[in-house]
Curated annotation (Swiss-Prot):
Name of the protein in question: S-ribosylhomocysteine lyase
Family annotation (InterPro entries): LuxS_sf, Metalloenz_LuxS/M16, S-ribosylhomocysteinase
Family: Belongs to the LuxS family.
GO biological process: quorum sensing
Keyword Lyase set for record: yes
PANTHER family for this protein: S-RIBOSYLHOMOCYSTEINE LYASE
Length: 169
């Protein structure tokens, strides 16, 4: 099985919250697709709570589109990482890291200011959510407060390159 790009970076050296360009590729038609690692907390040190990350998924997906989509950028998907330390965002285009940081910051502010109670969580029903009872707005708000309090930095692949001696044989 091939070694995926996400496992070629040293997770012990990642800062969080931080943006990282995980991958850039060009489609056969010439479109740029960029995948961002949006790391909310430090791997193996902190972890996002299940209900909180689920609620944040519902909020983050819409708010990031509000603040980042443009004539040259269109978000395809924002999905939580299985390790529950952040989200992957795939998009058409190549926004700057600064633009992503700005959109993420505004999205966290929106999560706190535009969603005052559970009734305002988008798609929170059995028809649109596969686990609609597994949410916590309180935890999502705490995630947003933590991100805003710490500030969002940038992780660079060259700074996180994993020493090949550490790879599993």
């Amino acid at each position: 099985m091939p070694l995926l790009d996400s496992f070629k970076v040293d997770h012990t050296r990642m800062n969080a919250p931080a943006v990282r360009v995980a991958k850039t590729m060009t489609t056969p038609k010439g479109d740029t697709i960029t995948v961002f690692d949006l790391r909310f907390c430090r791997p193996n040190i902190d972890i996002l709570p299940v209900r909180g990350i689920h609620t944040m998924e519902h909020l983050f997906a819409g708010f990031m589109r509000d603040h980042l989509n443009s004539e040259s950028v269109e978000i395809i998907d924002i999905s939580p990482m299985g390790c529950r330390t952040g989200f992957y965002m795939s998009l058409i285009g190549a926004p700057s890291e600064a633009d992503v940081v700005s959109a993420w910051t505004k999205s966290m502010e929106d999560a706190l200011n535009k969603v005052p109670d559970v009734s305002k969580i988008p798609e929170l029903n059995e028809y649109q959510c596969g686990s609609y009872k597994e949410h916590s707005l309180e935890e999502a708000h705490q995630i947003a407060r933590d991100v805003l309090a710490k500030g969002i930095g940038v992780n660079r692949n060259e700074d996180l390159a994993l020493d090949e001696k550490l790879l599993n044989p």
